[in-house]
Amino acid sequence: MFSSLLPKPKYSSHEPTSRIKLKKVRAHEKSNQLVKLPENKSDIKVTHNPSNSESTISQLHLNPDGTLNYNLTIASSNSNSRKVQSSYEDTIPLKVKFPNLKHHFPRYTVETCPDDSLKECVEDTKAAINKMINEKMGVDEKTNNKKDDVTYIKYTSNNLVNDPEGSDDERGRERIIQIRNYQEDPMLPPKFKLRKNRHKNPSPPPPLLKSSNNEQTSKLTKEDQAKWQIPSAISNWKNNQGFTISLDKRMVAANGGSELATNDVNLEKFGELSQALENADKQAREEIKIRSEMLKQLAIKEQHEKENKLKELADIARSKKLNNKRPPNGDYDDVKKKTKY
């Protein structure tokens, strides 16, 4: 198959055969005959059985080497208006096959289109969209086509309402009502608000009542009545209604409805605790005083030691100075008088 894509040889007298034609013959003739390919260019007629009406191949095209060219054979069997993709290259898109190809396809409008195909397409599309809109809105085509769909109703009012005097004139009591279907705008916001079906808490269980027998019933005491008194809920954070609530009621509500209990103070234990705290305070003060005295004595002792060291160093320096200034011949007392300390 690839030999057909090669160029024609220059230095040879080889001429490939062009085609093999099929010719229809009569039914009594047989067409199953082998035909030899000629060496020179010529047309070969091949007969086939005309009873096989399903076959659409009318010509067989051959390659230069004598093999059947399927591409040309399939293309010739179809009409000229149809394009046959007989190879892999035919399936490749043009944008992939020629990436740098610049093409300008004609874009017609309704006015510039040579035929009425574009106009028909626009009308069909418009009709389909209108049909879908009418189906959504629930409007029939018959009612939509009628522009003046108006009905009139004649109505006669009651004597008691419009004519209190009781006159029998029907002309003054006749009314004509006009009924017209107005189309509603589908883009208007909804008129009714849809509320969610919020599930409420179930109802409380039924109360357990006492029996009506006089033997088992007993009168309520004050203690039982006080237990059944439930105080109102008072919040320390919210007061939407703005009520003024006294402090004692707020304290009762904060304690869960029970009254404030007074706490008794144990005086004996409290006295022992205060005495123990006083003793601990005294002991701590004495320890601090002793510690401060010891630190003071140590500081005085260190100061005396430093003074003694300084005196010793001064005496040593003085003796060295006297030894250096003493004359070799002379009275020591005269020199001592002249020196100034």
From Swiss-Prot:
Protein name (Swiss-Prot/TrEMBL): Pre-mRNA-processing protein 45
Keywords: mRNA processing, mRNA splicing, Nucleus, Spliceosome
The organism of origin for this protein: Debaryomyces hansenii (strain ATCC 36239 / CBS 767 / BCRC 21394 / JCM 1990 / NBRC 0083 / IGC 2968) (Yeast)
Family designation: Belongs to the SNW family.
Pfam families: SKIP_SNW (PF02731)
Superkingdom assignment: Eukaryota
Gene: PRP45
Role noted for this protein: Involved in pre-mRNA splicing.
Top-level taxonomy: Eukaryota, Fungi, Dikarya, Ascomycota, Saccharomycotina
GO cellular component term of the entry, any: spliceosomal complex
Localization: Nucleus
